[in-house]
């Protein structure tokens, strides 16, 4: 188990609401993981921890330094995947379409001027905006602004700024379908791309943007529908973009790659 402070503890139960702290775990560079003087027998590590420290390259780097066999993406590709703007720059260099975006620096997030930033955002992206942290996941700190005004814009930027130094202001795509793909790397370094699967949200009886609550907090949670029901040409384009994106950020092992579809337009989201 990993505490919010980043401390590791060996657990006796597979699943528990409470963390037992009597057996702290330490990583030794080049040697592995230890509880006291006892080395833990680790066959492989699946870095499935969400958010900061877990999927941003930090945990991956620790595993590599401790010489623990790591499944999935390494430090570089994990960091790129978490930092949305950096990833989009790489994707665009490979002619993969992404959502039109304006990046707000730390100073702008803190001090504005928000009236000028709103005018700039609406001029570039339109009246409806989507605001999110630049390096976060699970829809944390995200706001949708239909017909955005100064107060709602400032509130959204400040909220996203709680989770990231930089904030992304994006064009709010609508109508919108959200689809997901999965990429698996084979032993001979080939790629198998599965999907796309259509995200269905029964709570709202529609298909679209997945909030944090819909992902984790509801009984009738969103689910994936396969086959997606999209036109074959759209599906084939999505699968090809997913393959190119995986290679572009030097991903390894496996990855989930998400897209937005609006009419015949495709956007790689994350």
Outline where the language-model segments fall.
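ATP-binding N-terminal substructure of ATP-dependent carboxylate-amine bond-forming enzymes
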Residues: 1-76, 80-86, 104-117
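Short beta-strands and strand-loop turn motifs
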Residues: 70-74, 100-103, 133, 270
């Amino acid at each position: 188990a990993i505490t919010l402070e980043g401390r590791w503890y060996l657990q006796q139960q597979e699943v528990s609401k409470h963390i037992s702290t009597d057996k702290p775990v330490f990583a030794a560079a080049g040697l592995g993981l230890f509880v006291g003087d006892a080395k833990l027998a680790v066959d492989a590590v699946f870095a499935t921890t969400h958010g900061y420290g877990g999927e941003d390259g930090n945990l991956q780097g620790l595993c590599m330094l401790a010489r623990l066999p790591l499944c999935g993406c390494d430090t570089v590709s994990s960091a790129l995947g978490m930092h949305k703007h950096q990833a989009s720059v790489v994707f665009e260099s490979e002619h993969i379409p992404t959502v039109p975006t304006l990046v707000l620096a730390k100073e702008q997030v803190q001090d504005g001027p928000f009236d000028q930033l709103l005018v700039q955002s609406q001029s570039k992206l339109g009246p409806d905006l989507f605001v999110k942290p630049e390096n976060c996941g699970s829809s944390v700190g995200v706001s949708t602004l239909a017909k955005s005004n100064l107060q709602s814009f400032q509130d959204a930027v400040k909220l996203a700024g709680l989770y990231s130094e930089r904030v992304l202001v994006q064009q709010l795509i609508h109508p919108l379908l959200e689809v997901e793909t999965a990429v698996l790397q084979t032993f001979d370094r080939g790629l198998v791309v599965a999907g796309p699967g259509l995200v269905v949200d029964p709570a709202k009886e529609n298909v679209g943007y997945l909030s944090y609550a819909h992902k984790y907090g509801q009984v009738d949670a969103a689910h994936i529908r396969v086959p997606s029901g999209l036109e074959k040409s759209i599906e084939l384009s999505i699968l090809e973009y997913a393959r190119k994106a995986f290679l572009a950020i030097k991903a390894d092992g496996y990855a989930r790659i998400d897209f937005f579809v609006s009419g015949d337009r495709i956007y790689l989201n994350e």
